[in-house]
Amino acid sequence: MLNNLNQPKGSTIGVLKDGRTIQQAIDGLENPVHYVKDVSITPSALLAVAVEAARLGRTVEFGPGHYTNQGQPFEVDFPLNLDVPVGTFLDFPIIIRGKTVKTVRSVATNLTAAQCPAGTTVIAGDFSAFPVGSVVGVKLGDNTNGSASYNNEAGWDFTTVAAASNTSITLSTGLRWAFDKPEVFTPEYAVRYSGQLSRSSYFIPGDYTSGLNVGDIIRVENIDGTDGVHGNKEYFEMLKVSSIDSSGITVETRLRYTHVNPWIVKTGLVKGSSVTGGGRLKRLEVRGVDTPKVNNVDVDRLIVGLCYNIDVGEITSRGVGEPSSVNFTFCFGRGFLYNVRASGSVSTTDNSALKLMSCPGLIINNCSPHNSTSTGSQGDYGFYVDAYYSPYWCWNDGMSINGIVTETPRSAVTRALWLFGLRGCSVSNLSGAQVFLQGCAKSVFSNIVTPDNLLELRDLSGCIVSGMANNALVLGCWNSTFDLTLFGIGSGSNLNIALRAGAGVTHPETGVPTTLGKNNTFNVKSFSQSSLAVTLSIAQQERPIFGAGCVDVDSANKSVALGSNVIVPTMLPLALTKGIDSGSGWVGGRTKGGIWFDGNYRDAAVRWNGQYVWVADNGSLKAAPTKPDSDSPSNGVVIGP
């Protein structure tokens, strides 16, 4: 018999047989859930609950407690909606995994990458079920992560069958990369597009109605285009079919890249999943999901990959000592990432507490990664955006990043925030520690605040960078503008220099090895009080422009030092106070209509090779080696008339 029905909401007085309170039962009528209270629930029982909840479109809600799933990971390939409330700890891995490509049949092999190198056309195995002329795909085996050593950690290849038997398959084209334990499969739907699909297009011409429907996610795998980072051909993207008829596909978001002769392949992403509630999870992997939502949970380790339209926010990750604590890879569409605290990553190679790899269009706000540790010669950073996951060079195109606060990592490499391969991005409000911008194109980086640290800028093309740092290093770079306030000088190769410019390595868009920077504008305010300070030390730059924003202080040792290979430097009127290296290449600011100098000897003199020149009150032109204190100083001379 149930009593006290008027107890406050959430009361534990009056409990049903399944452990729910009366209020939970009432709430369940309005928003049906599958309620899990037994912390000793078995893996098979938990799977049965999840299957039934997915069938009915309901949420699996856990009661308070410490759940271990008997030490087993919990993996599903269907939509999973979890409510993990405050006071609940799911102390086991949860994996939601869709299919990168929908397949009909497949054959796994045990060949090593050495036995299946790039260019391979014949693969041993029983492929008698594969029709000649049909499309096949090749991917890494399920039990291997690939390796950058043979340029394949994530590659998929597509071709057609030239011959097949119970002993081998012959591919019509050689594999683009080596594959370890390659799996050969027949995709449910894949066609080769002939021609170019241009970046920013919404429409893919052709009749795809036999295999695709509205809402499907397709993978567009470039073959001959050169729109990857460094002009590479290895890139792909995922798009959602918004409408389709016999004339073609209209996609939900514009193409991020230009593709030439690409494959268009149907994926098997899980349609929607969510994890919310305020509780804690040991490990959550969301892979191959359309429109996943992960909100308001503590996740010791979070991995999101090959997803579309992600919504991830209000996350705290304490880390588990792996190379990254929160990781996003190949997330396409219109995604959101916000309000994330990530820490506790440990690595021996380049990685970070919060890492993103090739996530075009992602909007990122208010993240605070920290407490990262590297035990090797490379760094484990706080925040790292990368664009090379072998073999793919996919631009982080059209990203918006705002409000990243990090700290110096516990490692020999002191970089804390590293951005590589951004194109057409808006980045603002970066602070806390050393910032490194590399290989980015046509992007704006503003409000960088790291006054105690070096700011590194390498191989940027068409970028605008503004902010403050201790000192700055500019290597290469083309058609870019640097509006910087600097408070100190560097050490090592940057010794006593506020801003040093030197040779670059590779143009980010063309991939052409290019050491000479060109057409860069330096608007630098240097406020170092050191008597050894050199404001601008410039080498390996063609047509550098020293802008009107340049300022330094009287205590500086030198304003501009020119090193090797400085071609046609240009100076605009500026406020540098100390020596500037001479050279035959110097050109000045160009004007039309003349320059007006109003005033007299006090404020209208022109300094010319150490001489002050002015027009006296009587109209004569005069000169003096020191600034005149009258219209007729004792050391002045009349030039004429």
Curated annotation (Swiss-Prot):
Which UniProt key words apply to this protein?
Answer: Degradation of host capsule during virus entry, Degradation of host cell envelope components during virus entry, Host-virus interaction, Viral attachment to host adhesion receptor, Viral attachment to host cell, Viral tail protein, Virion, Virus entry into host cell
One GO biological process from the UniProt record? Answer: symbiont entry into host cell via disruption of host cell glycocalyx
Reading the lineage from the top rank, the first entry is Viruses
With respect to pH, the record says: Optimum pH is 5-8.
Temperature behavior is: Optimum temperature is 20-70 degrees Celsius.
Listed under GO cellular component are:
virus tail
Cystine bridges: none
| Main subcellular localisation | virion
The name under which this protein is listed is: Depolymerase 1, capsule K47-specific
Q: What is the lineage of its organism?
A: Viruses, Duplodnaviria, Heunggongvirae, Uroviricota, Caudoviricetes
